[in-house]
Amino acid sequence: MIVGDMERKHNINLFLLSVLLLMTAACSTTRNLPEDETLYVGVKNMEILNEDKTPAGVQTLEEVEAALSYPPNNAILGSNSLRFPIPFGLWIYNDFVKYQDKKGVGHWIFNKLGSTPVYLSTVNPETRVKVATNLLHDYGFFNGAVTYSVDSLKNPRKAKLSYKIDMANPYYLDSVMYLKYPPRADSLIRAAYDQRVLHKGDNFSVLKLEEERQRLSTLFRNNGYYYFRPEFITFRADTLRKPGMVSLQVVPKAGVPADAKRPYYIGNTSVYLTGYKGEEPTDSIVFPGMTLHYSGKKPGIRPGVLAKRFFYQKGQLYSQARQNFTQEALARLGIFKFAEFRYAPQDTLPGCDTLNVRMNATFDLPYDGELEFNVTTKSTDQTGPGAIFSLSRKNFMRTAATLSFQLKGSYEWQTNSTADGNSSKLNSYELGTSFSLEYPRLVLPWMSKKMMSSRFPQHTSFKLYASQLNRARFFKMLSFGGTVSYDFQPSRVWKHTVTPFRLAFNTLQHTTTRFDTIVDKNRSLKISLGNQFIPAMSYTFTYDNAPLKKRNNLWWETSFTSAGNLTSLVYAAFGKGFKETDKKLLNSPYAQFLKMTSEVRCLFKVGEKQHIATRLMGGILYAYGNQTVAPYSEQFYIGGANSIRAFTVRSIGPGSYRPEDKQYGYLDETGDVKLEANVEYRFPILGDLYGAAFLDAGNVWLLREQKNEEGENIRPGGLLTLRNFAKSIALGTGVGLRYDLTFLVIRLDLGIALHDPYDTGKKGYYNIPKFKDGLGLHFAIGY
């Protein structure tokens, strides 16, 4: 028997060695190159002469180097010179190119895993140096030049490139003058002089000239010059007056049309509404500021709702900004299939300075229905299907509001064995429904028309919901409630959400003996899961610079929640102390706490398709007054696919505490304080397949020791202290795959635990008893 095993192992080793030798023999990266092509393997050297280290010079050099850079096959981080030593993509291309025009598995492997060779002709260095030289000239380096040379390698079918960049002396602006503009336009230029892009002493830059041209055109169009265009502005540059200096004149182009030289005022506004079935307008109504043409007995939308989205009035100067605000506000209503504006002179008389406005719009379908099916796999060993049915009525009661109904349900079963040996049986379900009414404005009685007519999005949402959660072998819980929330965005990057009313009620309909045994040992857990109201209000602000389209993105969100305090103030007004406990709302206890969370995410672009993503999240929850334990749904937990991926959900914390019954102890692993940090490097592998390497750290802690009736600490090690803070941080690393389907990203992560916050019986910082015990596999959707 032993001899047989040895023979099998020997045969396997021979087979693997044979495969390796065959791959090595076949793995030529130039075997299938066309005869007249050379494989490009990167940039050998990029020499800089007369380098300009000023901010303008650094920016110029970055642009020039970007124009010259071209990553070869298997580049590291998009580098033009660093490459991975094993070119799998090229090997696959060479071995499977014969399947390029065929069908089957070979064709799929070629398309998805193969990497097309980067030829020297593809890089086209001659064209690149011309582009780079033009960039130098555009940035004011008129004497600059870029040259290249081809460096042959040991393999004559491969080559590298070397570039030489001579920045020579740059030119600067000596003077900037705005000449030959009509008096009114000249006054506008002088009034906005502080906003100019061009300044004396700046580096000469063609890009800055174009930016100034756009600025002036926008300035004129925002002040009545409807027919003005950027191309009506030209520049005169004199480089002979002073060596290395440019005397610049910004002047109108010769032959500017007469109608572009005068401002226009807004005349009559007419709105033509076409039904979603194509019904043409048959009637009209005159409303202050507009004439509304519609089909049917009534306009499809209330005239007042429409009028509040128009940011101009009759007699005002035409403004491109107000036109853009109006179009954006109408698009946000979500009730039109399309809407277009046309401006035309009020008459054909010479010198006419009035534009009539016509808006043509077609209503979208009034109902939206959606049926969504999904399969959920959770890191708590729960998996199962779910479904969501949604039905929305747009333009409800002709107010542009949306009335929505949603019905959802899901089933889950446990995929591992339970403590009593049972396995894989249906053990959980959730059913829920909700009604919501959302207005595209702030619905407040004291809100002025000016505040309601914000150029940025505003929403008011009223929502009622109910859900039933059944955790077999534990409990059945019914939750219902309602919210009123206001969203408004004062700028492109800032958003505020105010929820002045949020009332939820949780009640346990049924519990099992196993669940009762767990909570009887922990009074705090019993209170947090008990029947109670949660009367709360909250405020959230969000910063997101993604609309600015910067290279690196920053997202920051902070939330503040207050629960039960207003209710306790009402009780205090009637003689019950603010700190008095066991007060009730509708004959049930209510929660009282303060909660704050903050999360920052940064996404840094380090290559063409490479990113480094960082995340820092913290939160604190303080329960007091009526109840010193916050509801279970509000407490913090950690672990899982979107947290520390080396650990499953609620498998660590608080602090270094470890439940005696680990199988069901996750109910007890929550806290009042949370700190979590992640850093992840994302890089392309092949085609739409991306890889990731990550590092996660964090934990949850308690603000107070929790004791039983005998005064014993029931969660030792869970208290937040500076003394053991570092040791109580869980740490994990890992790698993952991301498959980008454009409309969603499928994510598979393998987490590897490096440090467990509790005593595992193993000494040292790496205290994972067995390597396999520290592995966590997570499947998820989205980043």
Question: Which role fits each region the language model picked out?
Answer:
Residues D5-F15:
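Bacterial N-terminal signal peptides that target proteins for export
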Residues E7-R8, S28-R332, F341, T354:
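Interaction-mediating elements
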Residues M23-A26:
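C-terminal motif of bacterial Sec signal peptides marking the signal peptidase cleavage site
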Residues N50, I165-N169, K180, V250-A254, ...:
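Flexible glycine-/small-residue-rich
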Residues L188, P299, S319-R551, W555, ...:
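Gram-negative/organellar outer-membrane beta-barrel architecture
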Residues L292, G296, T376-T380, T497-F683, ...:
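C-terminal outer-membrane beta-barrel translocator/porin domains of Gram-negative envelope proteins
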Residues L371, L403-L407, F462-L464, W556-F560, ...:
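Membrane-embedded beta-strand positions of outer-membrane beta-barrel proteins
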Residues A697-L719, F743, G751-Y766, Y783:
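C-terminal beta-signal and adjacent terminal beta-strands/loops
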